[in-house]
């Protein structure tokens, strides 16, 4: 994968997250902000999830209250380089815990 393809795929990931949060109809207030390649999700309780792209490594990084995760694209899924879990699974687990209610991005 070259840099432009990586950015296209990361942009697509950011857009999906932003669209899902725009459509969010849960009880919790969840905000999303994108600034310079960093996507920050802020929850009503003040906690945050931060997602950023690491261009030199062609990775997406996810920082949550539970820890930090690094994802490589394998096929059509972003996969954690330590646990083998998908980006969406880990994001949903963290968002659900931090929101205090079920959050789905799929």
UniProtKB/Swiss-Prot annotation:
Q: Which Gene3D superfamilies match?
A: Frataxin/CyaY
List the record's Gene Ontology CC terms alphabetically. cytoplasm; cytosol
Q: How is its activity regulated?
A: Binds iron under oxidative stress conditions, but not under conditions emulating the intracellular redox potential.
Q: What happens when the gene is disrupted?
A: Cells are not affected in cellular iron content and sensitivity to oxidants.
The protein's matches in CDD domains, at most eight in alphabetical order, are given as: Frataxin (cd00503)
Q: Which keywords does the record carry?
A: Iron, Metal-binding
Keyword Transmembrane in record: no
Q: Where are the transmembrane segments?
A: none
Q: Which domain of life is it from?
A: Bacteria
Q: Give GO terms: molecular function aspect only.
A: ferric iron binding; ferrous iron binding
NCBIfam families per the UniProt record, alphabetical = FeS_CyaY
Which family is this protein grouped under?
Belongs to the frataxin family.
Per its database record, what is this protein's job?
Involved in iron-sulfur (Fe-S) cluster assembly. May act as a regulator of Fe-S biogenesis. Can bind both Fe(2+) and Fe(3+) ions. In vivo, has a positive effect on Fe-S cluster biogenesis under iron-rich growth conditions. In vitro, can inhibit IscS cysteine desulfurase activity and the formation of Fe-S clusters on IscU. In vitro, in the presence of IscS and cysteine, Fe(3+)-CyaY can be used as an iron donor during Fe-S cluster assembly on the scaffold protein IscU.
Q: What is this protein called?
A: Iron-sulfur cluster assembly protein CyaY
